[in-house]
Regions:
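Conserved alpha/beta enzyme-core scaffold
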Residues: 1-551
Length: 551
């Protein structure tokens, strides 16, 4: 018998503390009256708690976040907030009021400027900026939550939860708390009496401690909807190069598209330009993707075999219900999204990730963290890296081999698709990422790089494509990036003879090298030129949010 055994160590402190707090709340069942939520939170929380708050990419537990911001800072303070997405003003009100102190997150979007300011003012401490699945993983290691605040559509009085198309992060967040003696509170839009009144059970009631009916339906952002009317000729040109110079060249059959008008253009060119090239059935068959409305024409044209989704998208519910062969749906017909599983699929099961960024340096390192803007990364670092644990082969993965060797491995295609200048004439290509200086001023141990250059296989701009996986040295890699960087300082740093040699060797291609005339990149190539066209393609099943309606 060792010394620890003789001291009578207590092995159930977390469980005992949870039971104490539940007794303090003194609720007769699992349903918290809407108007009592603030006082209940003050009984269930303690200073310094680790609190998961569902902020997702789209779905927001906004009633819980608003009520959390109303607790008494004298009672509840210095919380350690763990949030996949920081997207609402009250998320940061928590820090201004002293209710919260530390933040671990993945993405901030609209709150990126304010996070940076709060950090500068000393009101907020950053634990780390994560990719989504990294943050979920830490909930099961060193960030076990004391409390999880999540959102669903419906619940019964036993806590059974229907999360439906917007399941997103919820299962990963709930399980970490429910099975390590954390407290789980779910806000719902509607309370029903019995399980049989739920469309299906996405999370069992035994995982949920309390449910509360919100004062209004939870906020959800149509984050991945892009109006085709805003797609420019530059986007179309880049999309043509992507389809012919990357997708067809490497036989990309499974993929993820990042958010943006450039990838929306690719989706809308598949039924037109892709058809002209005879590529249907050869590329773009399997997708890990939010249900982009701009993918509807490709689905209807027979290009797409399957789509697994990170989250839902407002207006796509009935279209998805009518296409169960394509999407993952439950017996009730509604989609089941799951960001954790979709991120895993995007890491190990797809041939390619293609997405944009705000800054790229000379070696193709990229970041969305810039001076005064701490936006985070979302899923890009996970989707946009080559997982060395992968063992199954596909044509595209094998196509990245540069020499025959049975001990070599293939590689995921990671494509950075950017215009050489951002809006406001800010160069995308820079000598040094702002992230380096941000790390110094913020006391971060490492620069917040989104995608490291050694994972990037291609850089695609309106100038052309750099096939970086074929670079034979860092110096050549830098020259290849410069060759497609336009008139930025990076681009002006390479001479015409070097560019000509790179084009001659096929390591860099311009549109003309692919047989693409720039004058052919017109909006007439788009399978849909407006949101109304997407509705027509869907046979009226797509119901776009009001802000995207022009009729």
């Amino acid at each position: 018998m060792n010394a620890e055994q003789t001291t009578g160590r207590v092995w159930n402190r977390r469980r005992t503390e949870k039971q104490r707090r539940l007794a303090e709340a003194n609720m007769p069942g699992k349903v918290i009256p809407t108007d009592q939520l603030v006082s209940v939170l003050e009984n269930l929380l303690a200073p310094g708690d680790r609190v998961v708050l569902e902020g997702n990419n789209q779905k927001q537990a906004d009633f819980l976040s608003r009520m959390l911001a109303e607790v008494n800072p004298q009672k509840i303070h210095d919380l350690h907030m763990i949030m996949p997405s920081v997207g609402r003003s009250e998320h940061l009100d928590l820090f201004e009021k002293g209710i919260a102190r530390k933040l671990d997150f993945s993405f901030s979007g609209t709150q990126s400027l304010r996070i940076s300011q709060l950090l500068e003012d000393g009101l907020l401490e950053i634990g780390a900026i994560h990719t989504y699945i990294e943050l979920y993983s830490r909930l099961y290691v060193d960030l076990s939550p004391n409390v999880a605040l999540i959102a669903g559509y419906k619940a019964d009085r036993k806590g059974n939860l229907y999360t439906g198309p917007s399941t997103e992060d919820t299962p990963a967040l709930v399980e970490a708390a429910a099975f390590h003696d954390g407290i789980v509170i779910a806000q719902v839009n509607e309370l029903v009496d019995d399980e049989c009144d739920l469309p299906r059970v996405d999370i069992p009631g035994s995982w949920i401690d309390y449910v509360v009916v919100a004062d209004k339906p939870f906020f959800i952002e149509p984050l991945f909807t892009r109006d085709p009317r805003l797609i420019k000729q530059e986007h179309i040109l880049m999309a043509m190069m992507a389809i012919k110079g990357i997708y067809a060249e490497h036989q990309v059959q499974s993929l993820n598209h990042g958010i943006g008008f450039n990838t929306a253009a690719i989706e809308l060119l598949l039924p037109t330009y892709g058809e002209q090239l005879g590529l249907k059935g050869k590329i773009c068959k399997h997708w890990t993707l939010n249900p982009h409305p701009t993918l509807i024409p490709a689905i209807e044209s027979g290009w797409v075999e399957s789509v697994h989704c990170f989250g839902g998208e407002l207006g796509m519910e009935e279209y998805i219900r009518a296409r169960p062969d394509i999407f993952f749906t439950g017996p009730d017909g509604s989609m089941r999204s799951n960001r954790a599983f979709c991120q895993l699929a995007g890491q190990y099961a797809v041939d390619m990730f293609i997405g944009s960024t705000l800054q790229v340096d000379g070696l193709a390192n990229s970041s969305t963290v810039t001076r005064g803007r701490l936006s985070g990364f979302g899923g890009a670092p996970n989707m946009g890296h080559d997982p060395h644990g992968r063992r199954h082969a596909t044509p595209a993965w094998l196509n990245m081999l540069t020499e025959p060797d049975p001990m070599q491995r293939g590689k995921k295609l990671v494509v950075q698709m950017v215009e050489t200048f951002q809006a406001g004439v800010k160069p995308t290509f820079v000598e040094t990422l702002d992230a380096v200086e941000v790390a110094k001023t913020s006391g971060m141990p490492l620069a917040p790089v989104m995608i490291y250059g050694d994972d990037v296989t291609h850089v695609l701009t309106e100038e052309g494509i750099a096939y970086l996986y074929r670079a034979e040295s860092l110096e050549e890699r830098r020259a290849m990036v410069a060759a497609v960087a336009g008139i930025t300082d990076i681009g002006l740093g390479v001479d015409a003879k070097r560019v000509a040699a790179l084009r001659q060797s096929g390591k860099v291609v311009y549109p003309e090298d692919l047989g693409i005339r720039r004058s052919d990149a017109t909006r007439s190539l788009l399978a849909a030129g407006s949101v109304a066209d997407l509705v027509e393609w869907s046979d009226g099943l797509y119901n776009p949010p009001a802000k995207f309606r022009s009729w």
